[in-house]
């Protein structure tokens, strides 16, 4: 079963587009997907289907400035002044909506890329409300970072690539 709905963003401007996917069997838990930069949550439909087949309720939304949220608000790429904090609070609002509808189930977050950073902030503030968190495509140590930066600067200075920005 699919529930599609909107809720008011923390920024009090946007309406956030959200979905709850419910399996046909008795659910064993809830997984909230937090997508990355420039993405939308429907990019994860194959994963959502697999998780539902395993008995999980899955929920997701499109962040401010992203996907269907951007379409319905006509605000592409506009996160506002507190965009990152807004996205984290919107994820918490979604969690509250889902927990009210489906109480007493284990609640997990899956954050990909930028979504993993949102999930980290979420854990810092609301971690006691979670059972587990998966961080995917997140940052880590880059041992040759300085060398890579210098190589990229050189390529930009030479005007290599389709786009270069000397600033």
Question: PLM ranges: what are they?
Answer:
Residues 1-25:
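N-terminal cap/lid segment of alpha/beta-hydrolase-fold proteins
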Residues 111-121:
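Glycine-rich nucleophile elbow surrounding the catalytic serine of serine-hydrolase chemistry
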Residues 102-113:
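Alpha/beta-hydrolase fold nucleophile elbow
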Residues 41-43, 50-74:
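Conserved alpha/beta-hydrolase
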Residues 36-39:
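Active-site glycine-rich loops that stabilize anionic/oxyanionic intermediates
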Residues 119-167:
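Alpha/beta-hydrolase-fold enzymes
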Residues 34, 61-63, 136:
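Alpha/beta-hydrolase
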Residues 79-99:
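Alpha/beta-hydrolase active-site loop
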């Amino acid at each position: 079963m699919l529930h599609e709905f909107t809720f008011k963003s923390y920024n009090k401007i946007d309406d956030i587009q959200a979905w709850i996917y419910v399996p046909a069997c008795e659910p064993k838990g809830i997984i909230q997907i937090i997508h990355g930069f420039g993405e939308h949550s429907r990019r994860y439909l194959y994963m959502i289907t697999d998780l539902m087949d395993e008995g999980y309720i899955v929920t997701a939304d499109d962040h401010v400035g992203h996907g269907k949220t951007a379409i319905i608000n006509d605000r592409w790429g506009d996160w506002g002044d507190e965009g990152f904090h807004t996205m984290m609070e919107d994820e918490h609002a979604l969690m509250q909506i889902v927990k009210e509808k489906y109480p007493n189930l284990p609640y997990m977050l899956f954050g990909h890329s930028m979504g993993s950073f949102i999930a980290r902030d979420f854990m810092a503030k609301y971690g006691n409300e979670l059972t587990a968190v998966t961080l995917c495509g997140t940052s880590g140590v880059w041992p040759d970072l300085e060398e890579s930066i210098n190589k990229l600067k050189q390529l930009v200075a030479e005007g290599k690539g389709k786009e270069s920005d000397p600033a």
